[in-house]
Amino acid sequence: MSALPFSTICRHSNTPLHLHSKSSFIGFDQRNNIWQLFVITKSSSSRAVSKLSVKNVASDKKEELKEPLTGQVAGTTNEFVPDSTAIASSIKYHAEFTTSFSPEKFDPSKAFFATAESVRDFLIINWNATYDYYERINVKHAYYMSMEYLQGRALLNAVGNLELSGPYAEALRKLGYSLEDMGNQEPDAALGNGGLGRLASCFLDSLATLNYPAWGYGLRYKYGLFKQLITNDGQEEVAEDWLEMGNPWEIQRKDVSYPVRFYGEVISGPDGSKQWIGGENISAVAYDVPIPGYKTRTTVNLRLWSTKVSTEEFDLQAFNTGDHAKAYAAMKNAEKICYVLYPGDESIEGKTLRLKQQYTLCSASLQDIIARFEKRSGRTVNWETLPDKVVVQMNDTHPTLCIPELIRILIDVKGLSWEKAWDITKRSVAYTNHTVLPEALEKWSLTLLQDLLPRHVEIIRKIDEEFIHEIISEYGTGDLNLLQEKLGKMRILENIELPDSVVELLNNTIPAVDSVEEIDVDDSDIEATNKKDEDEEDEAGEEEQEEDNDGEDLVLENKIEMTFKVDRKLPMMVRMANLCVVGGFSVNGVAEIHSEIVKEEVFNEFYELWPEKFQNKTNGVTPRRWIRFCNPDLSKIITKWIGTEDWVTDLEKLAILRKFADNEDLQLEWMESKRRNKIKVASFIKEKTGYVVSPNAMFDVQVKRIHEYKRQLLNIMGIVYRYKKMKELSAEERKQVFVPRVCIFGGKAFATYVQAKRIVKFITDVGATVNHDPEIGDLLKVVFVPDYNVSVAEMLIPGSELSQHISTAGMEASGTSNMKFAMNGCVQIGTLDGANVEIREEVGEDNFFLFGARAQEIAGLRKERAEGKFVPDPRFEEVKSYVRSGVFGTYNYDDLIGSLEGNEGYGRADYFLVGKDFPSYLECQEEVDKAYRVQKKWTRMSILNTAGSYKFSSDRTIHEYARDIWRIEPVVLP
């Protein structure tokens, strides 16, 4: 049995280190007094008895290895795991030879990197095995393309998925550390921001666990979004240098890079072919991150691109003459593409940088996909089979340029015709919509795109032109107003003249005379008229007849121009979401209510044209990270009462808990587990904020991106009302009326989103006042946890008792934090929006606190507001006045509170209906207090939330994508 083709000479322990029998084997051996790291794999299936052999670097002889503890030949048992001594040996080896730390001491940072690199050895072996096998059988792959991946820490997740938590914990104890301490040393990977990136990471975990052949593609951001600091001025942003000490999980592929071009010009060849030349050229370099599945050898790949230019671009002459900025201008210009996630786009420079990011992701990834497709195809490449081997899933509109880029590669590089390239592309690309917010349905300036990507604009214009003809074919030219309405909503290009071919078509098909009026006349009149006409025709001749025809054409052209006129005052735009729908074979929403809104409102015209394209795929989250690993206490209870740990990969088994919801023993265990988690949260809050909170209070949590539609403002306004009412009561009355609460917020506001940053400032000001009020004490605390990320979520969610998902109905596509909270037995208060609708159905209406207007009412309510018919609740007016009184400090909140007032105008008129839903929200919170006072009832609700959360596993979601969109099958390694 041959070894993997790499070995490392080292000095260390002679204890063999081996993997689970379904995986591989690593160890150390001594030949001629030289220590050697060897790697062993098994060719037989895990069910068969097998022997392991090791390749000796010096002699290439194969020798059987014996287990050091049992004396048996390695591999003669079906199941084995590495022991702690072997793992400790591996960690010490990496501490000495791999890490970039001083050799004098074995400090926590060094210990973490050595531990991570030890784990990475296992991942690389499984990664190699996975993709060697996929290459051999040439299986169809799903390629998930996303601008962000919010991975969180990888160490505990990796050792958990590999079933090595116990051995690693014991090994680290021998070395003077704990596995938990090592996990806390790891920084979160700053590759994402919110639900979009976290969903992508959950999907990769499920793809690996379920053995689906897939890759993820993204960008390797040097500084992420930003690190959030909370000061007296609110939120401040600083660069998050998560790569400062390196990333032990990534493998730089120096041999995998692709050219990416910007600007330049397009020239035509004598045969009509197009060539994009000149401009600015950079290279995208691959960094691979192996993603392990749970209890499986399958390890999928996340390939991240970093950008650079060749050293030839360094202007040494300029540097030596003192013009240092000019010397490395090209290098910095390339590198900055991957500096920051979502750079500010208020300026033209910011917009250009974002487009460069999006195109870099698309171009490098597609070149990589096609290169691998060609390699697997052998000498003869049949491009018609590309959709049978490749499916690209665009995670929102950021990767939209995949569509014109794939066409460009197929036509300009591979020599295919337009017809073939367009057909292949339409069968290879799928689109997931994540938002109904107009500002998030990306539009880009045609002028900017033309400057940056001239060849792609040609392709987009061609797609738009063909699509217009398809619309005309569908709706005809009989009603120009209807046609104009359809084109106005469906065209890819906005506020741009019709193509010449379309104008010509309309000229040839629209009748010049719209109607003919019938009148009664005598026969004698007809004869006289005919005679007169004949005489006039003889005199006028052909010249006058031509003038009449020209006049008719001019009238028709004017009519077309007036009907399909463009507004020169408005910019010409490219609608990326429309391009996704036109260029992809599938469009899916991410929750049932969201998918209905997509079909009925956002893309209704497209749905009428192509109903077969549209479907729903309700989001999910991985139960490995979000229950099994982040809440081990609860996981043990679930396993005990269900009777098996199979629920980790078959979440439907959680439903078994329903029959035990009233069991007093389970309820007691459940409450004790929750309290232990709350104590951890209280300690964490003190560490991060300095505030001391009581674990006896209800932990009420809203953690998510700060945005007006997510309505953190509604939450904090409700807290202000609660605080004001407390101040009006005596100490005894307060205790009787109010349940003690710790109100926890977390989330980042985009650096340029002024109103969201005002909300953060408001929350922190309220907290500073309430938390230092001796009259209130532990009855109410308000905490904003800074720099919210995956690791913070893993701490807060297990200890949460009430979670708030209170977006304006119809504006949240799905949400995934609501699913994580439900899995961990957290009762929810929310609107009928996004996945809330389905969560409420699954956990039971009695176990979900519902309030607020419904999605179908929102448009009418906004209209009423604009007409001045809305009458605010007196309690809402009371809170606004209280805020303006200065009780929470000297900050001027007029702009924030003013957004909730008036009937019209930008930034006014309470667009997100905080005032409308405020009374319903307060009444619902009263019901929450009542339920929490009866702990037995509350615990029952908590258990039923966990039991009803099984639908929201990303495993279920991925199975549906694989079956209905990607058409791929699981591939289990032999």
Explain the meaning of each model-derived region:
Residues 2-16, 20, 29, 35-974:
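A conserved ligand/cofactor-binding region detector
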Residues 22-24:
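Intrinsic disorder/low-complexity segments in short proteins, especially the signal peptide
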